């Protein structure tokens, strides 16, 4: 009976996430200066029918942005889950540990260097630069983790690494041309605006391939959650496994930072929301729930960012912080009460 109840709960949870995703997808497509009926939206998406202005707005502007939000929101959430698993730390995440700031730093260097020479920047170059920055920051975090076993100190160290990277980024920006500063400033605040179908295709390839590998690692992750000794007894190569966790989480985080800039709290808050909804920590269930939850959370936050003070658009990172930070505070309070 318990197994049946759990199966029903899992099913209901995924249905809720799927319904929210569809609802927010339609709401986002319809939100903006031009409002369209659901039928008009469906005709444009599936039949490519509609007046020229509506078609251009939906197909060339809104759809690439919405799909980018779904893909990158899901990727960032899964990246946070992998980092929490690696460090066995409930508030580990790309933003808090300074990994996003490291990616931001290297991308800033690349943008200023190439834009000052009137050289366009491809999606692949941005992702590689962000990945390099993520790995550099992760290297520093791992060095600190070896010396410090206290959760609070690890988080503080990550925040300090983030501040250092941000300070260097600000220093670099002071020597950039005005036009380059505008491009970098808009990107560094965190935004899903300006996405193209080319960006979406690149995201799909990178995130899909990474997620396939993550799914295949569900069983080793499940064993690792029960302790390194147990995982070793189950045949998991701990060194290879830990390296893969770092690489996969960094790739997902780098992809997000390259296209949308640093986005806060999604990688921390959503995995805990997914676990609370499912009432389980099984990776085979939590990973897809994290992806769907991250997509839903970011769709909601992007909708707020675009519409609340329209035509002025808020930074997506500011909105995610407003809704994500309370979750982190709740996690820390609950953990303290258990001690």
Give, region by region, the residue ranges found by the protein language model.
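Alpha-helical transmembrane segments in inner-membrane proteins
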Residues: 1-339
């Amino acid at each position: 009976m318990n197994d049946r109840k759990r199966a029903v709960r899992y099913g209901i949870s995924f249905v809720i996430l799927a319904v929210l995703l569809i609802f927010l997808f339609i709401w986002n497509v319809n939100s903006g200066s031009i409002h369209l009926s659901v039928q008009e939206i469906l005709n444009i998406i599936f039949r490519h029918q509609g007046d020229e202005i509506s078609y251009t707005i939906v197909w060339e502007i809104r759809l690439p942005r919405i799909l980018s939000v779904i893909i990158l929101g899901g990727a960032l959430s899964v990246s946070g889950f992998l980092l929490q698993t690696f460090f066995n730390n409930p508030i580990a995440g790309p933003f808090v540990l300074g990994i996003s700031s490291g990616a931001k730093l290297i991308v800033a260097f690349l943008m200023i260097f190439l834009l000052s020479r009137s050289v366009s920047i491809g999606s692949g170059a941005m992702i590689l630069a962000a990945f390099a920055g993520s790995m550099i920051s992760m290297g520093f975090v791992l060095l600190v983790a070896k010396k410090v076993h206290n959760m609070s100190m690890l988080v503080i160290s990550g925040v300090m690494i983030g501040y250092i990277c941000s300070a260097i980024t600000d220093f670099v920006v002071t020597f950039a041309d005005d036009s380059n500063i505008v491009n970098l400033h808009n990107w560094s605040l965190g935004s899903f605006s300006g996405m193209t179908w080319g960006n979406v295709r690149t995201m799909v390839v990178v995130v899909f391939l990474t997620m396939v590998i993550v799914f295949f690692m569900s069983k080793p992750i499940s064993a690792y959650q029960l302790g390194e000794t147990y995982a070793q007894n189950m045949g998991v190569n701990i060194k290879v496994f830990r390296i893969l966790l770092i690489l996969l989480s960094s790739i997902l985080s780098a992809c997000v930072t390259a296209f949308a800039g640093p986005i806060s709290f999604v990688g921390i808050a959503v995995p805990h929301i997914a676990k609370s909804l499912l009432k389980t920590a099984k990776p085979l269930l939590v990973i897809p729930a994290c992806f769907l939850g991250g997509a839903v959370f970011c769709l909601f936050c992007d909708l707020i960012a675009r519409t609340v003070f329209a035509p002025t658009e808020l930074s997506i990172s500011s909105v995610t912080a407003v809704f994500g930070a309370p979750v982190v505070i709740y996690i820390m309070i609950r953990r303290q009460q258990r001690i």
